[in-house]
Amino acid sequence: MKNVNDLIEKAIELRNRGLRSGEIADELNISRETATWLLTRARKETGAQAPKDIFIDWSTIGKSSSRLMLIATCMADMVEEVLNEMDTNVDVVVGIALSGVPLANVVAYQYGVDLAVIHPGKHRSDDTGKHHQMQPTVSENYANVKGKRCVIIDDVITTGSTMEETIKLIEDQGGEAVAIAVIIDKRGADTISNVPVKHLIRIGRVD
């Protein structure tokens, strides 16, 4: 995908496959607002200016298990820096579905700890604009986060809202988020909800 028209076509394709706007946003590594804009522009329903966002394509990493393992190993190394600085350790690695899970699996293996999976609320949005009322959930097929020190892993931070709701869920269940690690950070914050953020790449706009 090289331009906005390619993005619109891909967004339409994903919608036709049954994905909701929150899921489309994850697939294209854009904000939910940008995904909605792409879909409404495709239907000629908006003349609004595009949201300020950056499209990320890391599929050359994601489709290769060896590359994925190498990248996740780098993320584990970044996490180690935070844990040493805080003089703490980790009980469970939390992968944010979908793209954060394979990365988190490698990081959990590196540390010899359990893997938890959290499904963001936006994945259960009905596209009525009420997605913020939907709460994230911890998958019952993986480890729980109750009373545990957690490291959160995802591929991209865009607005940070998914991270914020993930941290809140962990805290509500008596756990503690001690670090966040991502491949790409588009938000540019050193912390989210007072949890340190580590990134392999940080992207900033010059407007």
From Swiss-Prot:
Gene3D superfamilies in alphabetical order: 3.40.50.2020
Single Gene Ontology MF annotation: DNA binding
UniProt record, GO biological process: pyrimidine nucleobase biosynthetic process; regulation of gene expression; UMP biosynthetic process
InterPro entries the record matches: GfcR-like, PRibTrfase_dom, PRTase-like
Keywords: DNA-binding, Transcription, Transcription regulation
Pfam entry (one): Pribosyltran
HAMAP family in the record: GfcR (MF_01214)
Similarity comment text for this entry: Belongs to the purine/pyrimidine phosphoribosyltransferase family. GfcR subfamily.
Domain notes: Contains an N-terminal DNA-binding winged helix-turn-helix domain and a C-terminal regulatory domain (or effector binding domain) resembling phosphoribosyltransferase (PRT) domain.
PANTHER family according to UniProt: OROTATE PHOSPHORIBOSYLTRANSFERASE (PTHR19278), PYRE-LIKE PROTEIN (PTHR19278:SF41)
Descriptive protein name: Transcriptional regulator GfcR
Encoding gene (name): gfcR
